[in-house]
Amino acid sequence: MATVSMRDMLQAGVHFGHQTRYWNPKMKPFIFGARNKVHIINLEKTVPMFNDALAELNKIASRKGKILFVGTKRAASEAVKEAAQNCDQFFVNHRWLGGMLTNWKTVRQSIKRLKDLEAQSQDGTFDKLTKKEALIRSRELGKLENSLGGIKDMGGLPDALFVIDAEHEHIAIKEANNLGIPVFAVVDTNSDPDGVDFIIPGNDDAIRAVKLYLGAVATAVREGRSQDLAVQAEESFVEAE
């Protein structure tokens, strides 16, 4: 089972919070102290909290649960996409469109349009159009791919959200709360932990820290999914006997 050690976290700078003047007092229980006017996060808390989150995500994945990775900050964007693809899950890494979860019906129509345009771009339909019309459609395709490409095969609402930066993604968290979807999130010292079911107190800016969280989550999810596949294989083997 994937776990992360104190040493891994120290090396990645997980313990460095934000400047003390930007803190959110609700994060006080997870703060060890301050150094040079920067809050230091208490990794004695973070390590077990993160490992609990990994165990739960592993369990969700083992039951065929769908996990949506959310991280739209430029610094995290590419790493979020990579991690989600690494474990065959879903992602939003550019802009969270309001209603992405709470207005799934409308989102589903946009996904259908995206898939139609993808098919047109591949089956030669674009070549038959005027240059202008082809350009308009390929621009629309690019825009839709950017915002919905990571969830186009999700086929319904996710079973959990894994979020990098609770402050930045507060709209996504609120939507998940409204729908009762569990939220796992990296929460820095400037963020509000309310609405996060599995809080991971840690640095949400340093790319090494972000990659550490994402890599561990992707591994936990992959392991969970393979348990599910193993169970399926065992069951079909028993049936065949």
Swiss-Prot record:
Keywords: Ribonucleoprotein, Ribosomal protein. One of its GO terms (molecular function) is structural constituent of ribosome. CDD domains: RPS2. One of its GO terms (cellular component) is cytosolic small ribosomal subunit. The keyword Lyase does not apply. Pfam families: Ribosomal_S2. One of its GO terms (biological process) is translation. It comes from the Bacteria. Belongs to the universal ribosomal protein uS2 family. This is Small ribosomal subunit protein uS2.
